């Protein structure tokens, strides 16, 4: 839950503030607006996929901890094969025989493919782990994660509009200041909502 909370929190900021983040880091020289748009879309896609990347790694380590390396290995093989298919399906592009895929998402398709496969692998690993340990409260885990996603959506929307309403003359320092203020307020909103909606790990952290 703690890993999901941290990744959704960061992901919501990356998604809502993707354009100004890219402009701040790369927006100079020959890096034009078209390049900014492409990289911003990639940052959004990676923001969506961040929780699944981390959860998959954590679940694999849990299996290693209970001395089961076969299950994550088998699921990884399935994930690799699925990734090959979904790379083709999402990326698309033209060929002498026409469009390779009706979606034709280009470079963004590569990220969405990896995200989908990681989500699939996380789901399989979680069900296998529940079967092995037979004491995981999956319904509570699902409810907690749905609340975390809702909190991430709200805080992300807030950070987007806070950034928009802060008016400062354009400069590198002012852009950095706007990002710090909007993302900082977003973190506070996320934390407060996590307490209100009773996210377990946040409650545990508050006890220390």
Q: What do these predicted regions represent?
A:
Residues 1-208:
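Membrane-embedded alpha-helical bundles of multi-pass transporters/translocases
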